[in-house]
């Protein structure tokens, strides 16, 4: 979807994640980035910024996510949950046999139970901190709560990621995607303790953040830069605003976005045009620096902030600190109470 079809960062309440008579699942749905900003900001620039690589990593990410979802459904084995079905209804799409979906009362996104997701590597504070299962910070971004969740995320990944990979190559975009996903998981774990989390929204917001910083650091080589900036800011603000609705985890979005934003300054700076054209210049022409001074400064500042941010956040997380104790207003990033809904148990 555009804004509404955005990335689903699914969060299920810890107290409801059991199966059978232990109660139902409650989903947190977060938005995937809007397909208007799907292409890189270079779309607004000159032809000299055209694609240079063939995209293969992003399609592989899509295949991997689909494969993991199929494995999750196989492990889930909905027809085997007899007690749960007696209380909540029957499996959906029974013709799929073992791969059929949980009853809609359990999971309205057409997917496995939260118990299965937890078993396969969903993000949960107690397991990450108390049981030292830090690998969940990475594995959770490959799991999806259902077909709707998976489809929205993969559609966003294809629209955003392929164009970026064509312009900057698989190494840089792969690093941004994975580190942004981890950054989103870390921030989410710092502020949310009563839910499990799956989904790639942190990684996808990281790609959006890198698009914005790439525009800033390469500002002088773009045409129509104001149009590009306004479009990106509009898309980003709309997506982040949706995150303040109930059952939407905005912390993963913000953490992924900030990580990707800093990585964009580090990995996506482009050489000046005069440097690229140096071979065609007359002999004896003084060589220009490959990058402008402000690009070097942004690179250094972003690298320091990124390393410091990860070190501080990980130390706080594994020491068991609660981010809400250090930021009294940050809970509003997760949900803003109104006359139409409450945020007490969100």
Swiss-Prot record:
What Enzyme Commission number(s) apply to this enzyme?
3.4.21.105
Q: Quick one: where's region Disordered?
A: 1-32
Write out the transmembrane intervals: 55-75, 141-161, 168-188, 196-216, 226-246, 248-268, 298-318
Q: What positions constitute the catalytic site?
A: 201 (nucleophile), 253 (charge relay system)
Q: Where in the cell is it found?
A: Golgi apparatus membrane
Q: Which reaction does it catalyse?
A: Cleaves type-1 transmembrane domains using a catalytic dyad composed of serine and histidine that are contributed by different transmembrane domains
What GO annotations for molecular function exist for this entry?
serine-type endopeptidase activity
One Gene Ontology term from the biological process aspect of the record: proteolysis
* This protein's UniProt keywords: Golgi apparatus, Hydrolase, Membrane, Protease, Serine protease, Transmembrane, Transmembrane helix
Q: Name one GO cellular component term.
A: Golgi membrane
Question: Which InterPro entries is this protein grouped with?
Answer: Peptidase_S54_rhomboid-like, Peptidase_S54_rhomboid_dom, Rhomboid-like_sf
Q: Bias regions of kind Basic and acidic residues — which residues?
A: 9-28
Q: Entry's Pfam families?
A: Rhomboid
- Membrane-topology descriptor: Multi-pass membrane protein
Homology family: Belongs to the peptidase S54 family.
Primary role: Probable rhomboid-type serine protease that catalyzes intramembrane proteolysis.
Q: What is the protein's name according to its record?
A: RHOMBOID-like protein 3
Q: Which organism is it from?
A: Arabidopsis thaliana (Mouse-ear cress)
């Amino acid at each position: 979807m555009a804004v509404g079809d955005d990335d689903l960062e699914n969060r299920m309440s810890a107290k409801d994640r059991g199966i059978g008579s232990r109660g139902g699942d409650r989903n947190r749905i977060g938005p995937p980035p809007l397909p208007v900003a799907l292409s890189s900001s270079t779309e607004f620039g000159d032809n000299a910024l055209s694609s240079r690589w063939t995209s293969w990593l992003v399609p592989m990410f899509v295949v991997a996510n689909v494969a993991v979802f199929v494995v999750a459904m196989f492990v889930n084995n909905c027809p085997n949950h007899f007690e749960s079905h007696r209380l909540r209804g029957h499996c959906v799409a029974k013709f799929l046999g073992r791969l059929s979906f949980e009853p809609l009362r359990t999971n309205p996104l057409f997917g496995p139970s939260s118990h299965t997701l937890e078993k396969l590597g969903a993000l949960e504070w107690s397991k990450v901190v108390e049981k030292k299962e830090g690998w969940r910070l990475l594995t959770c971004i490959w799991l999806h709560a259902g077909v709707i969740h998976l489809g929205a995320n993969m559609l966003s990944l294809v629209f955003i990621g392929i164009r970026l990979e064509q312009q900057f190559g698989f190494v840089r975009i792969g690093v941004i995607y994975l580190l942004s996903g981890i950054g989103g998981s870390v921030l989410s774990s710092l502020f949310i303790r009563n839910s499990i989390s799956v989904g790639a929204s942190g990684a996808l917001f990281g790609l959006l953040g890198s698009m914005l910083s790439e525009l800033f650091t390469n500002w002088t080589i773009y045409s129509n830069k104001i149009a590009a900036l306004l479009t990106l800011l509009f898309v980003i603000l709309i997506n982040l605003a949706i995150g303040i609705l109930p059952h939407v985890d905005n912390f993963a979005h913000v953490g992924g976005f900030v990580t990707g934003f800093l990585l964009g300054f580090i990995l996506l700076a482009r050489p000046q045009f005069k440097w690229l054209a140096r071979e065609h210049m007359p002999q004896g022409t003084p060589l220009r620096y490959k990058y402008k001074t402000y690009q070097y400064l942004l690179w250094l500042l972003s690298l320091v902030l990124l390393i410091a941010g990860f070190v501080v956040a990980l130390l706080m997380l594994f020491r068991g600190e609660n981010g809400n104790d250090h930021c009294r207003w940050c809970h509003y990033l997760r949900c803003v109470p109104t006359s139409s809904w409450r945020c007490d148990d969100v």
